[in-house]
Amino acid sequence: MASEENNDLENLLDIQLIEQKESLSSIDEALLSDPSNPELLSVHEELLSAIKEVEEGLLHLKRARLLEEADIVLNGLNHDAGVKPEHLEPEKTEEKKDLDGSKCRFRHTDGRWYNGRIIGFEGSDSAKISFLTPTSESMMICKFFMQQRCRFGSSCRSSHGLDVPISSLKNYEQTEWKQLMVGSKIWAVSGSKYDIWRKAELESWDDELQVGGVVFRDDKSSAKLGSDSLALSEYAQMTDDDGEEEEEEDEQQSASDSEDSVSSDYDEGSPQGIGFLESTNLPRGVQTDTALFAKWENHTRGIASKMMASMGYREGMGLGVSGQGILNPILVKVLPAKRSLDYALEHIRNGECKSEKQKKKRSRGGKRKRGKKFAEAAKAAKQEEESKPDLFSLINEQIFPTRHEKVHSESVKNRQNKGPVDRKALVEYQDEVRDLKLEMLKLEQMVNRNKKDLVVSEAATRRLKEVRKALASTLACQAAASNAIVSKENEKKWLKF
């Protein structure tokens, strides 16, 4: 155990020495720009003394290790036949010594394979592994643990290494970087190799120097890094030679075969589903040739189409595995206000009868009249299609009614053209004023609620101005009607005398 602890300490000191030398080089560069900075000079002196102490400690540890190995070799030479196990121990220690610090692949407790580095051994069958590409603080190896000075134990935020059986370790697969990989998303680390790895994008690659230019995605900074500081993924690359993968693939193939047989039996007995594509070798990426899947896409700006295309849907397909979903939006019938249901149903029937009578009309004429007839029919069909209110249109109409102003102006003009007003018209004005005040209150709340959303806020403000203008004109008409009624009643009183 003492030799293993010395090996761990030696590895840690090597890492610490590398980091201190890198820090010293950066301090030297800073001193070139500002040689009279007292803080930089003091840090430079402290780094030099720390590097000297670490080198002395490394020299002492290596000397002790070499003396121990020499004693083992001498003891093996002195004992010929009776001590075979002791003769084999140096071979095991040499093998472990060769493996110490080497890269490998190991399976984590989450079931994924990661790239790691052997930092020591726990007994004869277990190795202590650290993550080669740590992407979080919990994956980074604790420096104080390597120095046996960590006071937090199992509650430490950093990793104290993972105990993995030596038999389950796999050889490390080196990534072959090529020019074709430019533009791909990767993981990279800048500065020391023992920092946290970050997401980046490979911007360029030099095959001769084996150096790539990367752009980090978090802060948009760029750097030139070697292949040791780059990784295609935070997980380890798997090869076809892995026995466990072959077994998993066989199990998946057998499971997929059974699923195919079940699905074929299902297809024979039931209608074929159109929700998803059939199993094919064609790529199923984002469908760019289809902008709209259904009429309700007018309200989603094509975002839902892209999401559905990435899942394998095509235009005209119903939602669901067997295509049982609806294709058209839900129709909404807006009934006349302040009327009974009997009146509304009769009004709808009368409208349908009128449309049927219009369809039955025949006209005699030539090519010109037929063309005009077809154009009118197409225009009527388009208007009818647009006039069909769906759920989204109803919501938009309730929030931003576009025809409210026209209806209001027409109703005001009609009342003004009727001539003398009565109390019934005054009641209608009062109802309209109440509705406009309620709408104005809702719009004011909407403006206050959506101050951060510029588009909604501007639309609501514009509509609020229109409602205020309509309210002012309605109040003026109401006042005029009230004055007219009062003057008319006064005139009647005077006529009695």
UniProtKB/Swiss-Prot annotation:
Signal peptide range equals none
From what superkingdom does this record's organism come?
A: Eukaryota
What are the entry keywords?
DNA-binding, Metal-binding, Zinc, Zinc-finger
Recorded GO molecular functions are: DNA binding; zinc ion binding
Q: Which Pfam families match?
A: G-patch, zf-CCCH_4
Q: Where are the transmembrane segments?
A: none
Question: Where along the chain is composition biased (Basic and acidic residues)?
Answer: 373-387
Compositionally biased residues, Basic residues: 357-372
Entry keyword annotation includes Zinc-finger:
yes
Q: Which residues form the G-patch domain?
A: 300-346
- In this chain, composition skew of type Acidic residues spans 239-268
Q: Where are the zinc fingers (C3H1-type)?
A: 136-163
Which parts of this chain are annotated as the region Disordered?
236-281, 352-387
Keyword Zinc-finger part of the UniProt annotation: yes
Q: What is this protein called?
A: Zinc finger CCCH domain-containing protein 22
